[in-house]
Amino acid sequence: MINKVDIVCGLTWGDEGKGKIIGELLKNNKYDWVCRWNGGSNAGHTIYLNDKKYHTHIIPSGILYGIKCLIGPECFVNIDDLNSEMEYLKGHGFDISLLKISPYVKIITPSHKEEDANNPNSTGKGIGPCARDKYARKATQLKDQCPESLKSFLMTEDLHGTILCEGAQGFWLDINYGNYPYVTSSVTLPYSACSLGFPPCKINTIYGAAKIYDTRVGFDPDFEYLWQPEEETIERIVEEGKEYGTTTGRPRKVTWLNYDKLVKAINISGTNVVIISKVDILEIVNKFIILKDNKYINYETLETMKTKLGELLFNDCKLIKKIIYSDHPEHVNF
Protein backbone atom coordinates (compact mmCIF):
# COMPACT_ATOMS: atom_id res chain seq x y z
CA MET A 1 0.00 0.00 0.00
CA ILE A 2 1.27 3.48 -0.88
CA ASN A 3 1.05 5.92 2.03
CA LYS A 4 2.14 9.17 0.40
CA VAL A 5 4.32 10.54 -2.37
CA ASP A 6 6.61 13.59 -2.35
CA ILE A 7 8.01 14.95 -5.61
CA VAL A 8 11.04 17.10 -6.42
CA CYS A 9 10.88 18.88 -9.77
CA GLY A 10 12.76 21.61 -11.59
CA LEU A 11 11.02 24.92 -12.25
CA THR A 12 13.32 26.31 -14.91
CA TRP A 13 15.73 24.72 -17.44
CA GLY A 14 17.28 22.08 -15.20
CA ASP A 15 20.44 22.40 -13.09
CA GLU A 16 18.42 23.93 -10.23
CA GLY A 17 20.01 21.97 -7.38
CA LYS A 18 17.43 19.18 -7.20
CA GLY A 19 20.12 16.77 -6.04
CA LYS A 20 20.89 18.61 -2.81
CA ILE A 21 17.17 19.07 -2.11
CA ILE A 22 16.67 15.33 -2.49
CA GLY A 23 19.67 14.70 -0.26
CA GLU A 24 18.31 16.91 2.49
CA LEU A 25 14.86 15.30 2.30
CA LEU A 26 16.44 11.86 2.59
CA LYS A 27 18.45 12.90 5.64
CA ASN A 28 15.41 14.25 7.48
CA ASN A 29 12.53 12.01 6.38
CA LYS A 30 11.73 8.33 6.19
CA TYR A 31 11.19 7.12 2.63
CA ASP A 32 10.80 3.53 1.52
CA TRP A 33 11.52 4.22 -2.15
CA VAL A 34 13.26 6.89 -4.21
CA CYS A 35 12.10 6.81 -7.82
CA ARG A 36 13.24 8.43 -11.04
CA TRP A 37 10.34 8.98 -13.42
CA ASN A 38 11.75 10.61 -16.57
CA GLY A 39 14.76 11.14 -18.78
CA GLY A 40 17.95 9.12 -18.86
CA SER A 41 21.67 9.66 -18.44
CA ASN A 42 21.26 13.08 -20.07
CA ALA A 43 20.47 14.36 -16.56
CA GLY A 44 22.88 14.82 -13.69
CA HIS A 45 22.43 15.16 -9.94
CA THR A 46 25.17 16.27 -7.56
CA ILE A 47 24.91 14.92 -4.01
CA TYR A 48 27.07 15.87 -1.02
CA LEU A 49 27.32 13.13 1.60
CA ASN A 50 29.75 12.95 4.52
CA ASP A 51 31.82 15.81 3.06
CA LYS A 52 32.18 14.01 -0.27
CA LYS A 53 30.63 14.87 -3.63
CA TYR A 54 28.97 12.24 -5.80
CA HIS A 55 27.37 12.45 -9.23
CA THR A 56 24.46 10.35 -10.42
CA HIS A 57 22.78 10.40 -13.81
CA ILE A 58 20.13 7.71 -14.21
CA ILE A 59 20.26 5.91 -10.84
CA PRO A 60 18.10 7.63 -8.18
CA SER A 61 19.95 9.43 -5.40
CA GLY A 62 18.42 7.23 -2.70
CA ILE A 63 21.04 4.59 -3.46
CA LEU A 64 23.54 6.79 -1.58
CA TYR A 65 21.35 6.63 1.54
CA GLY A 66 20.67 2.90 1.59
CA ILE A 67 17.10 3.25 0.28
CA LYS A 68 15.44 1.15 -2.39
CA CYS A 69 15.40 2.89 -5.76
CA LEU A 70 13.43 2.52 -8.97
CA ILE A 71 14.16 3.64 -12.52
CA GLY A 72 10.63 4.08 -13.86
CA PRO A 73 9.00 3.06 -17.16
CA GLU A 74 9.18 6.55 -18.70
CA CYS A 75 12.98 6.48 -18.54
CA PHE A 76 15.45 5.71 -21.31
CA VAL A 77 18.41 3.49 -20.42
CA ASN A 78 21.75 3.01 -22.11
CA ILE A 79 23.00 -0.33 -20.79
CA ASP A 80 26.67 0.70 -20.93
CA ASP A 81 26.03 3.99 -19.13
CA LEU A 82 23.95 2.20 -16.50
CA ASN A 83 26.65 -0.41 -15.91
CA SER A 84 29.30 2.32 -15.61
CA GLU A 85 27.23 4.21 -13.06
CA MET A 86 26.58 1.03 -11.10
CA GLU A 87 30.31 0.29 -11.02
CA TYR A 88 31.04 3.87 -9.95
CA LEU A 89 28.61 3.60 -7.03
CA LYS A 90 29.74 0.10 -6.12
CA GLY A 91 33.35 1.31 -6.11
CA HIS A 92 32.40 3.94 -3.54
CA GLY A 93 30.86 1.32 -1.27
CA PHE A 94 27.16 1.76 -2.07
CA ASP A 95 24.77 -1.19 -2.18
CA ILE A 96 23.55 -1.39 -5.77
CA SER A 97 21.34 -4.39 -4.96
CA LEU A 98 18.83 -1.79 -3.73
CA LEU A 99 18.28 -0.70 -7.34
CA LYS A 100 15.25 -1.85 -9.29
CA ILE A 101 14.48 -1.08 -12.94
CA SER A 102 11.08 -1.10 -14.58
CA PRO A 103 10.92 -3.84 -17.23
CA TYR A 104 9.24 -1.28 -19.48
CA VAL A 105 12.12 1.22 -19.77
CA LYS A 106 13.27 1.73 -23.34
CA ILE A 107 16.80 0.74 -24.32
CA ILE A 108 19.08 3.30 -25.95
CA THR A 109 21.04 1.53 -28.67
CA PRO A 110 24.45 2.43 -30.14
CA SER A 111 22.67 3.65 -33.28
CA HIS A 112 20.54 6.02 -31.16
CA LYS A 113 23.66 7.45 -29.58
CA GLU A 114 25.49 7.71 -32.89
CA GLU A 115 22.57 9.57 -34.45
CA ASP A 116 22.48 12.01 -31.52
CA ALA A 117 26.23 12.59 -31.33
CA ASN A 118 26.41 15.56 -33.69
CA ASN A 119 23.37 17.42 -32.38
CA PRO A 120 24.74 20.64 -30.80
CA ASN A 121 21.55 21.14 -28.78
CA SER A 122 21.65 17.68 -27.23
CA THR A 123 23.72 15.96 -24.57
CA GLY A 124 24.45 13.34 -27.24
CA LYS A 125 23.15 10.51 -25.07
CA GLY A 126 20.70 9.14 -27.65
CA ILE A 127 17.58 10.09 -25.72
CA GLY A 128 15.81 11.86 -28.60
CA PRO A 129 16.18 9.08 -31.18
CA CYS A 130 15.13 6.49 -28.59
CA ALA A 131 12.05 8.55 -27.65
CA ARG A 132 11.14 8.84 -31.32
CA ASP A 133 11.32 5.06 -31.69
CA LYS A 134 9.28 4.62 -28.51
CA TYR A 135 6.36 6.59 -29.90
CA ALA A 136 6.70 4.84 -33.25
CA ARG A 137 6.49 1.62 -31.19
CA LYS A 138 9.86 0.48 -32.51
CA ALA A 139 12.00 0.83 -29.37
CA THR A 140 13.03 -2.21 -27.35
CA GLN A 141 11.85 -2.64 -23.77
CA LEU A 142 14.33 -3.90 -21.21
CA LYS A 143 12.20 -6.96 -20.44
CA ASP A 144 12.57 -8.11 -24.04
CA GLN A 145 16.33 -7.75 -24.29
CA CYS A 146 17.65 -7.77 -20.75
CA PRO A 147 21.30 -8.73 -20.22
CA GLU A 148 21.79 -11.56 -17.76
CA SER A 149 23.67 -9.21 -15.44
CA LEU A 150 20.59 -6.98 -15.05
CA LYS A 151 17.84 -9.57 -14.69
CA SER A 152 18.00 -9.54 -10.89
CA PHE A 153 17.38 -5.77 -10.97
CA LEU A 154 14.06 -5.96 -12.83
CA MET A 155 11.15 -4.63 -10.77
CA THR A 156 8.72 -7.42 -9.91
CA GLU A 157 6.87 -5.93 -6.92
CA ASP A 158 4.44 -3.06 -6.47
CA LEU A 159 5.56 0.22 -4.97
CA HIS A 160 4.59 0.60 -1.32
CA GLY A 161 5.09 2.83 1.70
CA THR A 162 6.35 6.41 1.42
CA ILE A 163 7.88 7.44 -1.87
CA LEU A 164 10.14 10.28 -3.00
CA CYS A 165 10.15 10.96 -6.73
CA GLU A 166 13.05 12.79 -8.30
CA GLY A 167 12.60 14.55 -11.60
CA ALA A 168 15.17 15.30 -14.27
CA GLN A 169 15.63 18.52 -16.25
CA GLY A 170 13.07 21.28 -15.55
CA PHE A 171 9.70 22.77 -16.44
CA TRP A 172 10.92 24.85 -19.40
CA LEU A 173 12.57 21.82 -20.97
CA ASP A 174 9.29 19.89 -20.93
CA ILE A 175 8.36 18.37 -24.30
CA ASN A 176 4.98 20.13 -24.16
CA TYR A 177 5.48 23.34 -22.17
CA GLY A 178 9.03 24.21 -23.13
CA ASN A 179 10.02 26.34 -26.12
CA TYR A 180 9.57 23.49 -28.60
CA PRO A 181 11.64 22.18 -30.34
CA TYR A 182 14.40 23.41 -28.00
CA VAL A 183 13.32 20.97 -25.30
CA THR A 184 14.04 17.55 -23.88
CA SER A 185 12.28 14.39 -25.04
CA SER A 186 10.18 13.64 -21.97
CA VAL A 187 7.54 15.12 -19.70
CA THR A 188 9.24 16.92 -16.82
CA LEU A 189 6.08 17.97 -14.93
CA PRO A 190 5.15 16.16 -11.69
CA TYR A 191 2.01 14.54 -13.11
CA SER A 192 4.28 12.27 -15.16
CA ALA A 193 5.56 10.72 -11.92
CA CYS A 194 2.28 8.81 -11.67
CA SER A 195 3.67 6.58 -14.44
CA LEU A 196 5.71 4.95 -11.67
CA GLY A 197 2.53 3.25 -10.49
CA PHE A 198 0.54 5.39 -8.05
CA PRO A 199 -2.62 7.54 -8.33
CA PRO A 200 -2.43 11.37 -8.22
CA CYS A 201 -4.37 11.45 -4.94
CA LYS A 202 -1.32 10.02 -3.16
CA ILE A 203 0.81 13.10 -3.92
CA ASN A 204 1.52 14.96 -0.68
CA THR A 205 4.11 17.69 -1.31
CA ILE A 206 5.67 18.97 -4.52
CA TYR A 207 9.05 20.64 -4.01
CA GLY A 208 9.99 22.98 -6.85
CA ALA A 209 13.62 23.96 -7.39
CA ALA A 210 14.89 27.18 -8.94
CA LYS A 211 17.90 29.46 -8.69
CA ILE A 212 17.99 33.17 -7.89
CA TYR A 213 19.09 33.66 -11.50
CA ASP A 214 18.26 31.62 -14.62
CA THR A 215 20.58 29.24 -16.46
CA ARG A 216 20.35 26.79 -19.31
CA VAL A 217 22.55 24.66 -21.56
CA GLY A 218 21.85 24.46 -25.29
CA PHE A 219 20.30 26.84 -27.79
CA ASP A 220 16.93 28.48 -27.17
CA PRO A 221 16.04 31.70 -29.03
CA ASP A 222 13.88 32.90 -26.13
CA PHE A 223 16.80 32.51 -23.73
CA GLU A 224 19.36 33.90 -26.19
CA TYR A 225 17.31 37.09 -26.38
CA LEU A 226 17.95 37.77 -22.68
CA TRP A 227 21.43 36.27 -22.37
CA GLN A 228 24.22 38.87 -22.24
CA PRO A 229 27.47 36.86 -22.30
CA GLU A 230 29.64 39.94 -22.74
CA GLU A 231 28.51 41.33 -19.40
CA GLU A 232 31.24 40.96 -16.80
CA THR A 233 28.69 40.23 -14.06
CA ILE A 234 27.28 37.27 -15.99
CA GLU A 235 30.75 35.84 -16.53
CA ARG A 236 31.45 36.13 -12.82
CA ILE A 237 28.18 34.38 -11.92
CA VAL A 238 29.26 31.45 -14.13
CA GLU A 239 32.56 31.19 -12.26
CA GLU A 240 31.35 31.85 -8.71
CA GLY A 241 28.23 29.70 -9.14
CA LYS A 242 30.18 26.90 -10.85
CA GLU A 243 27.66 26.97 -13.66
CA TYR A 244 28.86 24.00 -15.66
CA GLY A 245 26.59 21.12 -16.67
CA THR A 246 26.93 17.96 -14.55
CA THR A 247 26.50 15.76 -17.63
CA THR A 248 28.10 17.81 -20.42
CA GLY A 249 30.58 19.98 -18.53
CA ARG A 250 29.54 22.86 -20.77
CA PRO A 251 29.29 26.35 -19.23
CA ARG A 252 25.67 27.31 -18.67
CA LYS A 253 24.18 30.45 -20.14
CA VAL A 254 23.13 32.81 -17.36
CA THR A 255 20.60 35.62 -17.17
CA TRP A 256 18.45 37.31 -14.53
CA LEU A 257 15.50 35.50 -12.97
CA ASN A 258 12.42 35.55 -15.22
CA TYR A 259 9.66 36.03 -12.67
CA ASP A 260 6.75 35.42 -15.05
CA LYS A 261 8.15 32.09 -16.22
CA LEU A 262 8.80 31.05 -12.62
CA VAL A 263 5.19 31.83 -11.64
CA LYS A 264 3.80 29.85 -14.56
CA ALA A 265 6.02 26.87 -13.72
CA ILE A 266 4.99 26.95 -10.05
CA ASN A 267 1.27 27.16 -10.82
CA ILE A 268 1.14 24.51 -13.54
CA SER A 269 3.37 22.06 -11.65
CA GLY A 270 1.37 22.51 -8.45
CA THR A 271 4.47 23.29 -6.42
CA ASN A 272 3.85 23.67 -2.67
CA VAL A 273 7.38 24.37 -1.45
CA VAL A 274 9.69 26.57 -3.54
CA ILE A 275 13.43 26.30 -2.95
CA ILE A 276 15.47 29.12 -4.51
CA SER A 277 19.19 28.44 -4.34
CA LYS A 278 22.51 30.22 -4.84
CA VAL A 279 21.25 33.50 -3.40
CA ASP A 280 24.75 34.15 -2.04
CA ILE A 281 26.09 34.47 -5.58
CA LEU A 282 24.16 37.70 -6.07
CA GLU A 283 25.78 39.08 -2.93
CA ILE A 284 29.17 38.35 -4.46
CA VAL A 285 28.35 40.27 -7.66
CA ASN A 286 26.30 42.85 -5.71
CA LYS A 287 23.42 42.93 -8.19
CA PHE A 288 19.86 41.95 -7.29
CA ILE A 289 17.71 41.86 -10.42
CA ILE A 290 14.60 40.08 -11.70
CA LEU A 291 12.73 40.35 -15.00
CA LYS A 292 8.99 40.93 -14.59
CA ASP A 293 6.51 41.98 -17.29
CA ASN A 294 9.49 42.37 -19.66
CA LYS A 295 11.01 44.99 -17.37
CA TYR A 296 14.03 44.62 -15.13
CA ILE A 297 13.52 45.37 -11.44
CA ASN A 298 16.63 46.29 -9.46
CA TYR A 299 16.66 45.83 -5.69
CA GLU A 300 19.14 47.55 -3.40
CA THR A 301 19.99 44.54 -1.24
CA LEU A 302 19.59 40.78 -1.26
CA GLU A 303 17.28 40.91 1.77
CA THR A 304 15.01 43.40 0.01
CA MET A 305 14.96 41.21 -3.08
CA LYS A 306 14.10 38.10 -1.07
CA THR A 307 11.33 39.90 0.80
CA LYS A 308 9.75 41.45 -2.30
CA LEU A 309 10.13 38.29 -4.38
CA GLY A 310 8.46 36.28 -1.63
CA GLU A 311 5.56 38.72 -1.42
CA LEU A 312 5.05 38.54 -5.19
CA LEU A 313 5.18 34.75 -5.29
CA PHE A 314 2.75 34.25 -2.40
CA ASN A 315 0.35 36.65 -4.10
CA ASP A 316 0.57 35.05 -7.56
CA CYS A 317 0.95 31.37 -6.59
CA LYS A 318 -1.85 30.30 -4.25
CA LEU A 319 -0.61 26.72 -3.78
CA ILE A 320 2.69 27.78 -2.22
CA LYS A 321 2.98 26.95 1.47
CA LYS A 322 6.64 27.84 1.95
CA ILE A 323 9.55 29.56 0.21
CA ILE A 324 13.09 28.59 1.15
CA TYR A 325 16.17 30.57 0.13
CA SER A 326 19.38 28.58 0.10
CA ASP A 327 22.95 29.78 -0.22
CA HIS A 328 24.80 26.67 0.87
CA PRO A 329 26.51 24.67 -1.90
CA GLU A 330 25.93 21.35 -0.17
CA HIS A 331 22.51 21.34 1.50
CA VAL A 332 19.21 23.12 2.02
CA ASN A 333 17.95 24.20 5.44
CA PHE A 334 14.30 23.12 5.53
Task: Give residue spans per PLM region.
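Non-transmembrane, aqueous-exposed alpha-helical and coiled segments at domain scale
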Residues: M1-F334
